[in-house]
Amino acid sequence: MSDRVHERSMGMEEEGSTKNMKTKVLELPTKIKKILKNIWKVGKDDPRRVKHALKVGVSLTLVSLLYLMEPLFKGIGNSAIWAVMTVVVVLEFSAGATLCKGLNRGLGTLIAGSLAFFIEFVANDSGKIFRAIFIGAAVFIIGALITYLRFIPYIKKNYDYGMLIFLLTFNLITVSSYRVDTVIKIAHERFYTIAMGVGICLLMSLLVFPIWSGEDLHKSTVAKLQGLSYSIEACVNEYFEEEEKDEETSDLSEDTIYNGYKTVLDSKSADEALAMYASWEPRHTRHCHRFPWKHYVKVGSVLRQFGYTVVALHGCLKTEIQTPRPLRGLFKDPCVRLAGEICKVLSELAASIRNRRHCSPEILSDSLQVALQDLNTAIKSQPKLFLGSSQNGNVSQGNSGRHNPNVAVSQHINKDTNEAASYQNTGTPRGERMSRFGPNVSFSRLRADTLERRSAAATNERKILRQQLSRIVVLTSLEFSEALPFAAFASLLVEMVARLDNVIEEVEELGTIACFKDYDNNVDQKDVEVRVEKPADLVVGVE
């Protein structure tokens, strides 16, 4: 009997495994299609990735000729593999990143080789023991010094890779020279092949479809301004829609408002990396000054501070307690006009940076001040919504707290508190107390029993009050609580107007340092009235 049960269970397991295998085989085409779709999407989002991949392939093919062609191999030898390794390590997505790594690797190798040659020259005529001690001391001092220097922020940011290559090359040559006599010759050959690899990387990065980090940083700043403008307009339009939308999925990647300000919040590390790589690129202004890439980082920091208010504004759409839509409609026109003026300013700033010109002198027009004043007037015209209505309170009291939860809660608290106080004073009925203690009860026993009853009554009272106070927080006046969410929404719009000054100031300072052209009212008039559109996704290649 047990054998049959075992065979049956084995058969069921085999049948289940067969079904799972068939399911996986049937799902295989779908998975392959999904992978191919993702690969296609990567290239479609940024076609420069395809160009970079082709450049890497061509560079590796060129350095491989040092191994494949016999005349070149005889002249260089096995050190040709270092050229291949250099291309793999140095060739980056942007020209600035390639220059940074290439020059760091080249200079680090050259300086380390020169220092190792000097140490070899000094220790060559000494005895074997003294030479070993001298090499060991040099390795210790140089290793400790270079490692300590790597902790300096400026060196860590700009020359960390070069310091690492220097330390590696120096130890490789210095330590190997103690046992190998031809180590200097090998070092020369490796330096030549590394120089060949770096040269090929620089030629491919600077001359063949160059990708500039500075241009990426410039475009990303414009895209961030456009993204904030789009998010603000979309938030206000959705907040004042007459019909409520269906519940959306929790996937934030599909939220267009979130995608508008997401790049701003996540831009700190990308901006700093792009600014550093751009500082290595041979790009100058028309006055032959270095372009102020670091000031783009400051603009990004100010935009992040401004973006936090957009995040809070978006959060007003997701709160559990919402102002009724008829009540929102009372303030729709001034809010929409104010948001439109804010978006207009952001769009003008984006056009200013995109065209490398100063902002319009009338960027903060009277329309913004008028829209702000209209919103203030609209709010003051409805004081009962924000300060509460005494009439509503009287009606609620007349209906025994049915319409005003505070009254019912207060009555319930008073009732429970009176009951607790009654228990505290009496504890038990008078007759029961007298029969319980009797005429001969001692004073100490009576005092202890009284303290015990008071402690129990105080504990019960605290429990009652805590429960009822938590209800008071939630069950506030209905009319007052409905106006609170809109008050938060309106205050965030006003806060945006206040923070616009900081954004305008930083953009104008950037234009002054970068020598932007002056604003021409005739030429740039078409850029003043900018329509707010969803910004195109900018893919920045930072590795």
Curated annotation (Swiss-Prot):
Major localization class: membrane
Record lineage: Eukaryota, Viridiplantae, Streptophyta, Embryophyta, Tracheophyta
Superkingdom to which the source organism belongs: Eukaryota
Coiled-coil region: 445-472
Name of the protein in its database record: Aluminum-activated malate transporter 14
InterPro entries from the UniProt entry: ALMT
Listed transmembrane segments: 56-76, 80-100, 106-126, 129-149, 164-184, 191-211
UniProt feature, compositional bias: Polar residues: 419-428
Region (Disordered): 416-438
Membrane topology, from the record: Multi-pass membrane protein
